[in-house]
Amino acid sequence: PGNRALLESSLEQGLMDKLQAFLLELGKGFAFVARQQRISTESKDFYIDLVFYNYLLKCFVLIDLKTTELTHQDIGQMDMYVRMYDDLKRGEGDNPTVGILLCEDKDHSVVRYSVLNGSEQLFASRYKLILPSEEELRTELAREAEAIRLAMELGEQEASRGTEE
């Protein structure tokens, strides 16, 4: 069980590294803000995996990466992050915060966008022109997860060969 948690943690760290580089390389206005950024309620701390500011959209983009199956709790948590970020960090001239949930489990990759203010249809259509599509993110996530898993398996095989000799 501990080894499984370590494996998941390594996968998540590797995916965050690749995703951060991928978004910055897109050249579509992404500026890196923070990794594992803490936001707090009166009683609890929460950590957002990746935070960017998109200066073309004039909004924060929050990314939460899951290495397990996506749940309703994950979606609710992202909505809470977006609300809190809008309340605590969003500036006067900024558009609503966008949340992106990325889920990579063994079977498939899932990408969900979260833009809370339902009346922001105009903004939602605009962000789709600048942010990577769900399919682009899903493909990149699946490709990188597979590469990281293969590298980790190769490392395990080499380690077990070293103990046999």
Model feature map: region roles:
Residues P1-E165:
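Charged, terminal alpha-helix-loop-beta segments
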